[in-house]
Amino acid sequence: MATVLAGPGQALDASLPTIYREFRLLRDETGVMRSVATSMKLAAHEGNTKYISNYGRVTAYNVSDGADIAQAQNLADTATGYSPTEVAVQVILGGRTMRRVADPDLLGRTGRILNNAYDLKEDTDGTTQLQSFTGTTMGAAGVVISPGHISGAGARVMIGNSRANPEPPNGDIFAVIHPLAAHVLAGRLVPYTDVPTGTTAFGANNGAHGGVTVGPGRSGGMSDDIIRRGYKALGTIGSVIVKTDANLAVDANDDFTGAVFAKEGLIYVSEEEPRLDPDSSDKSMRGAVELNVWGSYVWGNYRASAYGNPVTFDASLPTS
């Protein structure tokens, strides 16, 4: 008969320590906001605000041959300011805790956790700034996104939201939407439907999308790629580069607000890039380390009414 010398409820079990060998960090959405913004630097000795100045328009007129030009106009300028504020995150690790804990890399891992927290706030602040565009809002609460919403919003941005005084922006135009809306957008591009003839559109504002087959519509490489890779294959629709960010807030009614905007219209001003600053100088804390990650930045809009349109759509969790 075999003798069990160690194990749960057996001999010597009190002598078996619990040793953890796998240590993992919870993952946050890394986000895309800095990649779709115009980045600027508030350098030392430049004050507390970064300014962008733009000059107004003047109008050209027909004049009669030989007549004196009497059309003098005032040239005006407008300054838009962006004032960074500090952001910080802190954890204090006790000296005795670090000596006793099973994770030999606790200090380094904690530093990465703090950096992740800073990055999460930075990106979330950027998604919140999208609501400050003041062009025409596309969609509404409960509306399911479609390709036409994206291309329509992009078409407006391409003329600066004005037919009377077109103001085409420089650079790329982006759409930042929630991944759950992008999932539906991708399904409508295949398109998925609940009947073979394609009479019912894919997507519902309660998450019951019902797409069980492929209906007639667009075909080719993009559709095939979307079927394989989902919304990550969206790419560009109507000259608008579609990006997703799960840090966009979804309200109690399953709706979110993102934007279709010109990169020129979303501003990120950095004063201090995030830095990890460990401090163990306080001897009364007996070996404790105070870990601080801090930086200084601000998000803002430029030409908010011309260069961006908010978009509000459903972001229900899929149920079918």
Question: What are these model-predicted stretches?
Answer:
Residues 273-320:
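Extended, compositionally biased alpha-helical segments that mediate assembly or anchoring
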Residues 60-63, 101-102, 184-187, 194, ...:
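Short helix/loop capping segments that flank catalytic or ligand/cofactor-binding pockets
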Residues 225-280:
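Glycine/small-residue-rich hydrophobic helix-like segments
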Residues 75-100:
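Short acidic, glycine/tyrosine-flanked loop/strand segments centered on an H-E-D-like triad
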Residues 134-230:
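Extended, solvent-exposed, turn-rich assembly/linker loops in the middle of proteins
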Residues 1-81, 312-314, 318-320:
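N-terminal "assembly arms/tails" that initiate or stabilize quaternary assembly
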